[in-house]
Amino acid sequence: MRAFVSALLALWSLSVFSPAAHAQSGQWLGGSAIQSSVQVGAPGEAWVGVWVDAPVVTTMRTRSPMAVSFVVDTSGSMAGPKMDNARLAAAAMIESLSDGDIVSIYGFATDVTEVSAPTVLDPVSRQMLLRNVGHLVAGGGTNLEGGLRAGISRMTSAPMSHAVRRVFLISDGQANVGVTDPRALGYLAAGATEVGTQITAIGVGYDYDPMTLNAVAVQSAGRMHHLGTPDQMAAILETELSWMSRSVALSAVLEVRPASGIVILGAATTGATVVDGVLRMPLGAITAGQRRELLFRVRVPTADIGRRTLATASLRFETPEGAHAAPQSAEVAMTVTREAPRATPAPRVAAMVAQYDASEAERAAAQLLQQGRQAEAIARLDAARASVASTATSYSFEDSAVQGALSSRAAELGAAAAGARAASSPAAMHERSYELQAAPMAADGY
C-alpha cells in the first residue's frame, strides 16, 4: 500500500494548487447553429451547439479546502479483492488530502455504518482515519439509498470555507434494500447539488446497475467510472483528486432561453432537460482547461427574410472560494435568406453532432451485445468509426482540440469494434456491453 500511496502523494505534490481568482475572467461561453443561414420557406429545424471552454491557467495559488465523503458498498459481493482495493483507495485518499480538509467514511450493506464521522484532517486524526478504514467489512444486502443519504447529509454540515465538495460512491451490485428505482435514486442524488456537492459514482465489475449509477452521476452533475477490475481504483482516484484540485468554477449551471417564436425541440446531451421551454444543464465543478458542450435542436420560423436570434445561453457559477462569479452570456443567431445558403456547416457543431451519433451507436451496440447480436453490434461500431473519422478530416477546424477529440473518438470506436469481435462468449459480450455504456457518459463529461 505504501507504494500506491507514495505514487498518489507524488501526483498530489503537482496538484496542490488551483487556479487563481482571475481565472474567472474572460469569456468561456460560445455557441452557434450548425448553419449560419437558411432559405426562406425551408424546413426550419436545426442543430445548435453551445459550449463552455474553461481557461487553461498557469498562475496558481493554494487550493481551496475540500470536504469529501467516501461511501463504500460493503455488501457480501464486495468481499475479497474489491473490498481490499476499496480500503486501499480510502487510505490513499486520506493520505493524499491536506490538513484542514474534512473526510467522512460510510459503509452500506443492509444497513449503513458510520466508519468515521466528518473529521478535520491533522496529523493525529489522519492516523485515526487510516485505522478506521479497516472497519470496512463486506456482508449483507445493498442499501444504496442509505449510503447516498449518509454521504450527502454530511455535506450539508460542511462549513462555507470548504466549497469543493465530493461524495465518492463505490458499488459492485444492484440496490436491493430501501429505494431501488434508478429514477428515484437519481432524484435523491440531485439533492446533492443544493449543497454544492457532486457525486463520483464508481461501478466495479460487471454486475452493477449502470442505469442507477449513471443517474446518480448525471443528476448530481458528477462523474461516472466503470472499473472492469478493482485494481483500477488507483487510476480513478488519481484523476478525481487532480480534477478537484484544479477547479475554476463550482455549482455551474448552463441555461439556454429561446428567442420569441423559437422552440427548443429537445436536447441531445446527457443531463440537459427542457422545462417550460428553457433548456437547463447543471455542470457542477469545472476544471481548468475543461470543455463542456450542449447540443440541441430548435424549430425556426422561416417565412420572413432577415437575421433571427435563436437563443441566449447563460452560464452561472461560483468561484472555488464559494463567491458568485459574474454570469456570462452568448447569443446564437441565424439568417433567413432569399437564396439557398452555400456556407458549409459550422465545424464545431458538426463535430458535436458526430460525437452524439457516436454515442448513440455505442448505446445501440451495447444493447445488441446484451441480446447476443454480435455482428450487428460490430457493424454499428464500424459505421460510427468511419463517420467520426470522416468528420475529423472534412472540416477546417480553427480549434485543433476539437479535431483531436474526433480522431480520438474514432480510434476508441475502432478499439470497441475490435473488442466486440473478440468477444467469444455471452459473458465476454456482456462485459463489452458495460464498456460501451460507459463511453457516452465520458464523452458528455461525466
Task: Identify the meaning behind each predicted range.
Residues 268-290:
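Extracellular adhesion/glycan-binding regions together with long Ser/Thr-
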Residues 17-23:
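Sec/Tat signal peptide C-region and signal peptidase I cleavage site
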Residues 5-16:
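Bacterial N-terminal signal peptides
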Residues 252-253, 257-276:
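A surface/secretory-pathway sequence property marking extracellular, secreted
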